[in-house]
Structures are given as C-alpha cells and as structure tokens.
C-alpha cells in the first residue's frame, strides 16, 4: 500500500498583499491571479489543512501620497486602507465559494450586514469545522500594518505557520530586481531580520512572531505549487524562526 503523505502544518495563516492580488497590473484585482490563488488554497483545504487568510489593500488604495499632500490625516488614510482590504476580502471569499470552499469573512471593524465581526473564538471554531477564514480590516486600528495584523491573527488562531506571499521567491540581502548579485537566504532567525534590517515585515510583526515562537515562511505565490510545497514541509522560499 502506498504511503499517504500528510501536510506538515495543520493550521496556517496566509498573508496576501494587495500587490500580490493585482498581478502585473498597477492597481485593482487580477482575475486570473485571484482564480489561481483560490485554487491553491482549495488544494490545501482538500488535504485537511485549516486556512486563515489576511489580505492587504495596497492594490486598491495607497494613502501615502494623499497624506503627503495634506489631503487626509494618517488615521483617516489608514481607515481607508482598512476598507480596501474589505473589498479584497469580499473578492477572495467569493472566489473560494465558487470552488465550493466554505468561507467566512471576518472584519476587525464592524461593518453591519456585509461582514461578520472578528472573534478569535469564533474563528477557531470555523477553522476546526473546515471553513476558511478571511480576516480583513487589519487590526482595526490605525498605525498598524496588515503584516502586523497577519502575525496577530496567526497567534490568536494558534497557527502552526505564518506564510507571507510575495512576488519574489524568498528574502534577499538586497533587491534582486535591482542587483544581479543579490543573495537569497534559505533560513534566517528573527533577530537576523531585525539586526540586518531585511524588510521581511515591519518591526512589530517580526517581534510578535519571535516572542510567540511562530515560524514565518516567505515565498513566491505566483510560482506554481509553491504554497503546497511550503505546507508539505518542502524547501521553498525563506524560513524565519527563533
């Protein structure tokens, strides 16, 4: 009898940036990218992996320029960004439901009948019942990034691994799109990331993962099979641990 290969991680938190959802577009959601992401996530669900997702909003709203021009304040700009993540979350939820994946959309901000309010207890229950949970509106507070929200949600739902999906295949010592001699790291410690200012995630996010000993994996979501490889425990991207 053939040996059944089981996923290494039973519950994960996947961070999808808004830029990842835009594909090759400057702004907006690339339908093909969204469809491929939903397929990759559906594969994990089929293997019994419990999946939580945090989505960013940079593909729909970037507030830095408006703030620089003095048109909106920082708090308002961050709130606009939170609402952008809700739109991305709605798209991701429907893409998953279209594949017959039961999905919950949970917001850190109360938004009436559009999205249910986030509760870690409810999220864990939904995940345990095989539903995917898409978390939107960041932490619900200004001044915190969606990377920080991803690490916070990952800790709250007791995820075995936090995955950051990017457009590059891991962490490099410098920008590989600008420098041909950029070197990729296969493994890093959280302290290395902080000391070398590698820009994997912001300081708060990295410290959360380090202090709660939750490993982080950075990988290229656009690479076919990469998400599955990470969850199966295969070598893919860059792994960051304590």
From Swiss-Prot:
Keyword Cell membrane: no
EC number, UniProt record: 2.7.4.22
Gene name in the database record: pyrH
Source organism of the structure: Acinetobacter baumannii (strain ATCC 17978 / DSM 105126 / CIP 53.77 / LMG 1025 / NCDC KC755 / 5377)
Residues given in the record as UMP binding sites: 57, 78, 139-146
Family to which the UniProt record says this protein belongs: Belongs to the UMP kinase family.
Functional description taken from the UniProt entry: Catalyzes the reversible phosphorylation of UMP to UDP.
Protein name: Uridylate kinase
Keywords: ATP-binding, Cytoplasm, Kinase, Nucleotide-binding, Pyrimidine biosynthesis, Transferase
């Amino acid at each position: 009898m053939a040996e059944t290969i089981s996923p290494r991680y039973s519950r994960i938190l996947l961070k999808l940036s808004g830029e990842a959802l835009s594909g090759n577009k400057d702004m907006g959601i690339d339908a093909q990218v969204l469809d491929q992401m939903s397929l990759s996530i559906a594969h994990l669900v089929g293997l019994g992996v419990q999946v939580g997702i945090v989505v960013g909003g940079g593909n729909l709203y970037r507030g830095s320029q408006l703030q620089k021009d003095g048109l909106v304040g920082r708090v308002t700009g961050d709130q606009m960004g939170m609402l952008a993540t809700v739109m991305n979350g709605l798209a991701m939820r429907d893409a998953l439901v279209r594949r017959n994946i039961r999905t919950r959309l949970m917001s850190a901000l109360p938004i009436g009948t559009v999205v249910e309010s986030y509760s870690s207890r409810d999220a864990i229950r939904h995940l345990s019942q095989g539903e995917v949970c898409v978390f939107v509106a960041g932490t619900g507070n200004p001044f915190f990034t969606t990377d920080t929200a991803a690490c916070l949600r990952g800790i709250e739902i007791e995820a075995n691994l936090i995955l950051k999906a990017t457009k590059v295949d891991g962490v490099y010592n410098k920008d590989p799109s600008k420098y041909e001699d950029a070197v990729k790291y296969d493994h890093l410690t959280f302290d290395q990331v902080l000391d070398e200012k590698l820009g994997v995630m912001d300081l708060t996010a990295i410290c959360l993962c380090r202090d709660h000993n939750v490993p982080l994996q950075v990988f290229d979501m656009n690479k076919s099979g990469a998400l599955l490889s990470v969850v199966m425990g295969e070598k893919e991207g860059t792994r960051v641990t304590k």
